[in-house]
Curated annotation (Swiss-Prot):
Protein name in the entry: Actin-1
Protein species of origin: Oryza sativa subsp. indica (Rice)
Any Pfam family the entry gives: Actin
GO CC annotations, alphabetized: cytoplasm; cytoskeleton
PANTHER family to which the protein is assigned, alphabetical: ACTIN
Amino acid sequence: MADAEDIQPLVCDNGTGMVKAGFAGDDAPRAVFPSIVGRPRHTGVMVGMGQKDAYVGDEAQSKRGILTLKYPIEHGIVSNWDDMEKIWHHTFYNELRVAPEEHPVLLTEAPLNPKANREKMTQIMFETFNTPAMYVAIQAVLSLYASGRTTGIVLDSGDGVSHTVPIYEGYALPHAILRLDLAGRDLTDYLMKILTERGYSFTTTAEREIVRDMKEKLSYIALDYDQEMETAKTSSSVEKSYELPDGQVITIGAERFRCPEVLFQPSFIGMEAAGIHETTYNSIMKCDVDIRKDLYGNIVLSGGTTMFPGIADRMSKEITALAPSSMKIKVVAPPERKYSVWIGGSILASLSTFQQMWIAKAEYDESGPSIVHRKCF
């Protein structure tokens, strides 16, 4: 009998921007690396350097100057399965150093994902990696678990997609889930664009990573956008400097809050969509009138794009303006929200009551990939 340590389930949250992976029962992911596959732009001239045909994650990131970087996941949906397989392979063998055929694997997916997508995930886990068991869970539901609630509305905003998912007593309400294809990567692109107006040019995939870092370190959300713009015009209090990898120092001011303002005003990037506050409100309004009060009182933020300072206050202000005046509104922004999907997965996969929920290899062999729709909902 293998001891329990050997058969710890693996939890892998495949985000558009970052993969978060580790062992069920841990309180944080062991491996966090970019969901990038890089291929050399030039053929190697140095003999014996042992060039690879593809690099994954941090290694691709560190060699980005000579690589073309591709993200296999776009807007939360896997668009390139060969590259995705490389990422999973890297996760299991290089990052976690485990044999996937010895561990059950819990994967995550965005809500409203195409059915074919989860079937393909299931197929790859069982046929390529020979896992003994697997499960696919919806990201936002896991975030709510991690916050210790069973009822609430989760605004999950990552690198590729944002969505609002109302959950009542542990069940997601699919008719009220709203998806917004506006997230961290669009903010990075917008920051690249507005920095160009300042005379700084960022164009390549490698330079995009620099701008992403700048966004993460310097951006914040204004409580009152117009007032903040006025302040920025008259004083230099919002200006901050940032050092580029080559030592050049650039200054950014109003761009710091103009960039994430797109979340509330998607028209900035030419999108005809409601902002995250309005999407959250619309999502609540699609729910039964009796449960709305519970949702307004438990608005939970999750994902890396909710890490901007000032987001909870602004969200609270905007939703208060939309909701009935007597309604008590509470926006919860847990400090670990960058990883709350993974943490929720870690909690779920280690529950004794969850153990009968896994899809076993035998069940897969009998029913094929479509079993995922019956067992994971």
